[in-house]
Every structure is written in C-alpha cells, then in structure tokens.
A protein has these predicted regions:
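A glycine-rich, hydrophobic loop/mini-helix early in the fold
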Residues: 77-103
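An acidic-aromatic pocket/loop used at catalytic or ligand-binding sites
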Residues: 30-72, 120, 126, 134-207
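Short secondary-structure junctions
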Residues: 72-82, 128-130
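C-terminal motif of bacterial Sec signal peptides marking the signal peptidase cleavage site
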Residues: 25-28
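Mid-length scaffold segments of soluble, non-membrane domains
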Residues: 97-135
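Bacterial N-terminal signal peptides that target proteins for export
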Residues: 3-18
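Well-ordered, non-transmembrane segments within structured domains
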Residues: 2-3, 93-95, 129
Length: 207
C-alpha cells in the first residue's frame, strides 16, 4: 500500500511538470507558426483586381446594354429553348469592402452556325474593348463544338457562347467581383435595361 501511495504521489509532480512543459512549448512555438499568407492571398488579390476595374454600376451602364443587344440578336422567340433563372448580382464581404458579382443565366437556344455567332459577337463587343477568341473541339454528344469567349479586363466581364453541331447553343456572361461606386442605392439591383426580360424568354425548368 505504501509503495502504491508513494507512486501516486510521485506521479502528480511528473504530470504537472509535463503540463507545464507542454504549455511552455506551445507559447514558445507560436511565433514560429504565423497565419499562412495563402489564407489571405485571395482577399488581397480580389481587392487589388477590383481596384483596377470599373464598378458594378459601370458595367450596367456601359457594357450590359450591349450584351443584352447581342443576346437578343442571337436569340429570338423562334429559336429560344431554355432559361432557368434571371440575372442577379451577389455580394461578398472582403476585408472591410463589399464586392459584387453580376451573373446572367445560361440561355439555351437552337443554332449551329458558329461563324455567324462569332461575327455578331465581334461586331458589337470588339468596339467596347473586348478581346474575342474561338476554340473548336470534337465532343461525343454534340459533334463539333465551338466556344466563343469575349473578355473585357477593364470591366471584368467574360461572355461565353457555345455553338454545337447538334444545334444546342448557349449564351451567358458574368463579371469578376467588383466594387460599387455608390451611384445607386442598391448595388445588388440589376440595371434597368429595355428588353432585358422579353415576354417570350420565360423561365423553364430543366427536364
């Protein structure tokens, strides 16, 4: 019994010593394990990019009317196929700044003439500073597929148009996260542009 009691009494100081050493090591090692810079790199990059680009309101004033014009020239009541949502602007806090992203729905339509589509895109968007490129590839389901991309780094806008041999074409655009210039009461309200939502371009659910 005495030996067991002595062992228990001897174990207590050892346990206390171990806890003390662990706490000391944790405190001493903390400076050597700072917050990794990778965790903050996205926020820094997003704010820097947004500072070099125009505002979300400027996109609605200067760019989106032409995007809708292009869309409505490519898509009409006779070749419209499917639209699953409406345009919207989302917001995200980054540090002490709110950034906004405009996203259009992907609209499906019937078309297989990639050259005609590219000509329409170039004629309207190249004068606004967009760079347009096209890439072709062979797919199993749709045959030849042409992806037409138009990018404007000043406004942070990217337009994607897919034209497929199967006649399943699609159109959509979105922005990078952008700052607000304060010119509107609600930066998340999409710009009021004529023909943004034609009566025939109804929302349809996926089949």
């Amino acid at each position: 019994m005495n030996q067991r009691a002595t062992a228990r009494r001897g174990a207590r100081p050892l346990a206390l010593l171990a806890y003390a050493l662990l706490a000391l090591c944790t405190a001493a090692c903390a400076p050597f394990f700072p917050v990794l810079p990778e965790r903050q790199s996205w926020a820094d990059e997003a704010l820097q990019k947004a500072g070099r680009m125009e505002s979300i309101e400027a996109v609605g004033r200067d760019i989106e009317p032409t995007l809708i014009q292009v869309r409505n020239e490519l898509i009409n009541e006779s070749n419209f196929s499917q639209r699953q949502s409406w345009d919207f602007i989302s917001s995200q806090p980054v540090r002490d700044t709110q950034l906004y992203t405009l996203t259009s729905p992907t609209i499906l339509f019937v078309e297989n003439d990639a050259h005609k589509v590219q000509a329409v895109v170039e004629s309207h968007l190249a004068p606004l500073g967009f760079t347009i490129r096209a890439r072709e590839q062979k797919t199993v389901e749709d045959g030849n597929e042409t992806r037409i991309v138009a990018e404007n780094p000043t406004y942070g806008v990217t337009v994607n148009v897919y034209v497929r041999e199967s006649m399943r074409a699609s159109f959509g655009y979105e922005t990078e996260p952008l700052k607000s210039d304060g010119s509107t009461q609600d930066p998340m309200q999409v710009a009021d542009i004529p023909d943004r939502r034609p009566d025939w371009m109804v929302i349809t659910r996926p089949k």
